[in-house]
Design a protein with these regions (language model features):
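Polysaccharide-binding surfaces and accessory modules of carbohydrate-active proteins
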Residues: 2-171
Length: 171
C-alpha cells in the first residue's frame, strides 16, 4: 500500500505557528510581532513543534532583512508587517489537504488568505487569496507567494563524509 503522508500542526495564541509536513518535507511559519514570517525548513520529516510542543523557531526573524513568509505591495505601500491573525481553515480532499490562514492588515483594509496544498509529495503548492476591503481599487505592485530566510548550517563540513570518495557530487 502506497500511502502519502501530509498534515498541519497548529499552535494558536499570542504567536500563532503553523507546521506543515508533506512527505519528508516540513515547513514552519507563524505570526511574530505583526509579521507573518518563515520559521524553518526540514527535509527529514521532523517537526519540532509537533514533537516537543515548543516554539521551534529555527530561523530567527531578526537575522534576516526580509523574514516574511510572503511579500505584498499595494499602491506602492509594502504590507510586510502589521498583520493580525483571524483564523485558519482545514479543507480535507480525497488525496490532499488545503490549509488556509486568514490574516487581516491593521493599517490597510486588506485581508489575505495564505493557502497551502499538501498531497504527500516532497513539495507543496502555495497561493494567496487577497481581498481589498476598501471602496476603491488598489494596484498590486509586488507579490511573492513564498519567501523568507533560508537556513544555513554552521560547520557544514563536519556533516559531510569523505570528500575524496568517488562521487559525482562535491560540496
Amino acid at each position: 500500500m502506497d500511502t502519502q503522508f501530509y498534515d498541519v500542526f497548529v499552535t494558536e495564541g499570542e504567536n500563532p505557528t503553523f507546521a506543515y509536513r508533506t512527505g519528508l518535507t516540513t515547513y514552519t511559519e507563524g505570526l511574530r510581532d505583526g509579521i507573518f514570517t518563515a520559521l524553518g525548513w526540514n527535509g527529514a520529516g521532523y517537526m519540532a513543534l509537533a514533537q516537543d510542543g515548543c516554539d521551534p523557531t529555527i530561523l530567527n526573524p531578526a537575522d534576516y532583512i526580509a523574514p516574511q513568509a510572503f511579500e505584498l505591495e499595494l499602491d506602492g505601500q509594502s504590507l510586510m508587517s502589521h498583520w493580525a491573525y483571524e483564523g485558519c481553515e482545514r479543507i480535507e480532499g480525497k488525496d490532499n489537504l488545503t490549509f488556509k490562514i486568514t490574516l487581516r492588515h491593521t493599517v490597510r483594509p486588506v485581508t489575505v488568505k495564505v493557502c497551502t496544498l499538501l498531497d504527500g509529495a516532497c513539495v507543496f503548492s502555495r497561493w494567496l487569496e487577497i481581498t481589498n476591503r476598501a471602496q476603491s481599487p488598489a494596484a498590486l505592485g509586488r507579490l511573492a507567494v513564498l519567501s523568507g530566510g533560508l537556513e544555513t548550517t554552521l560547520r557544514w563540513k563536519n556533516h559531510v563524509k569523505d570528500q575524496s570518495a568517488d562521487s559525482p557530487y562535491r560540496l
